[in-house]
Amino acid sequence: MSSNIPQNAVEVDTLSSIYTYKELSIDKLKHEYEITVGSNYIEQKVNSRLQEIAKNAKLPGFRSGKMPYDLVVTNYKNEALEYVVNSTIDYCSSDLMKKIEVKSHIYPKVDIMSLPNLNEEGEKSNFVYKLSFESMPEVPVIDLDKINLKKVEARIEEEDIKGFVDSIKTRFPSFVSVDDASYQAKNGDKLVIDFEGRIRNKLFQGGSNKNFKVTLGSGTFINGFENQLTGMKKGETKSFKLKFPEDYQTISLAGQEANFSVRVNDIQVAEDFGGDDEMAKKIGFRDCSSLKNHAKEVIGGQCEEMRDLLIKKELFDYLDANYSFDLPTDVVRQEQQRVERELGSKDDSCKEAERRVKLAMLFMKFSTEHKISLTQNDILNVIVNQYISKDVPFDRVFKHFKSDRQFQELVRGQALEHKVTSYIIEKVNKEEQIVSVKELKELFGNI
């Protein structure tokens, strides 16, 4: 090894002491070391690599492995040096981690400070690089005996069931045509219309339709259109001008003034469902009793979901307030970027990212201590419950999961969080609190 070794460096007695290291700085979890490898070692390894390459090297005019060695050196020296440098960095960095007893680390960064010029005669400069990394923090184990949570249970009353049934009447009205020719359309009525829209006397794309159904007050058309239809009668025709919003999604129409002509072909009003049993049958139930049972199940499911989210937030708040340890800044920075994409804002994004990283590390430590592992079903449940929708089929999400490592880590983290929190909530002390459905909704609305 070259004698050109930095002062205060520690020489490592491994593989003929191929490297020395010097501590540059340690700040909480951040570590920086300077590693020096003798030029003689690099030169020997490069020569060995070139000899390996020469066995199969090809060049026009020469058979495989028969290229003159000086041509091998000329054509492959840089490639060999790159290979040796990378493998040396891998070995020395890994060996140093063992020496300084760093069990795990995050995002190591290498900055090459100097490379030996192997073309120089005489003593050559050493290979020197800086290794920067963050070590994993010592994460405490969650103490279940110290956690006390509130388990909120909702009491479903007849009033709640009636409110649910009434909401069905509002959401799924049955419409009938109006026979009275003098009837004037009002908010909530369904109109069957023909319409045309023109800009500078030219019909624009999507600006006309026949027998189009629109419910007044639904906001189906641009602002002001449905207001113009209010008060019209069956068979009546009307023309009016409206201006498209400046931020309208179709750029060619944004901010443009259009002339509309509308004819009302029919006016339909919401029909009274009649008796409860008749109403239940119209929306697919055997009788009113079946509908009420369905309502109770739906309300119960909604209350259970709100209850679970409330107790989960209470647990998260407790862990965030009662456990403190150094967090790796690179991990927090990455999570902060994800938070900003989710929320569309930088406000409090750092604080939220720190909270998420802290909880994730607590859950990871807890899962190791309590031997909680993920199954394929745990992963699939997260994919199905959080990522599948009418517009995003399972096959597309699962294909993305298999091909994207970052998405895999995200889904696995969510699955582990769910499994660990469920385990903790099941084991800790819980005080039951009975509330009304309205009170539960208010509690949920405040989180």
Curated annotation (Swiss-Prot):
- Which residues does the UniProt record annotate as the domain PPIase FKBP-type? 188-273
For this record, the Gene Ontology CC terms, alphabetical, are: cytoplasm
Q: Which Gene3D superfamilies does the record match to this protein? A: 3.10.50.40, Trigger factor ribosome-binding domain (3.30.70.1050), Trigger factor, C-terminal domain (1.10.3120.10)
Q: Which UniProt keywords apply?
A: Cell cycle, Cell division, Chaperone, Cytoplasm, Isomerase, Rotamase
Q: What is its EC number?
A: 5.2.1.8
Keyword check for Cytoplasm: yes
One of the protein's GO biological processes: cell division
Reaction(s) catalyzed by this protein? [protein]-peptidylproline (omega=180) = [protein]-peptidylproline (omega=0)
Matching entries from Pfam families are given as: FKBP_C, Trigger_C, Trigger_N
- List locations, semicolon-separated: Cytoplasm
Q: Name one GO molecular function term.
A: peptidyl-prolyl cis-trans isomerase activity
Q: What InterPro entries does UniProt report for this protein, alphabetically? A: PPIase_dom_sf (IPR046357), PPIase_FKBP_dom (IPR001179), Trig_fac (IPR005215), Trigger_fac_C (IPR008880), Trigger_fac_C_sf (IPR037041), Trigger_fac_ribosome-bd_bac (IPR008881), Trigger_fac_ribosome-bd_sf (IPR036611), Trigger_fact/SurA_dom_sf (IPR027304)
Q: Which domain of life is it from?
A: Bacteria
Q: Which NCBIfam families match?
A: tig (TIGR00115)
Q: Please give the function described in this protein's UniProt entry.
A: Involved in protein export. Acts as a chaperone by maintaining the newly synthesized protein in an open conformation. Functions as a peptidyl-prolyl cis-trans isomerase.
> Per the similarity annotation, which family is this?
Belongs to the FKBP-type PPIase family. Tig subfamily.
Q: Which HAMAP family match?
A: Trigger_factor_Tig (MF_00303)
**UniProt protein name:** Trigger factor
Q: Which organism is it from?
A: Wolbachia sp. subsp. Brugia malayi (strain TRS)
Q: Tell me what gene encodes this.
A: tig
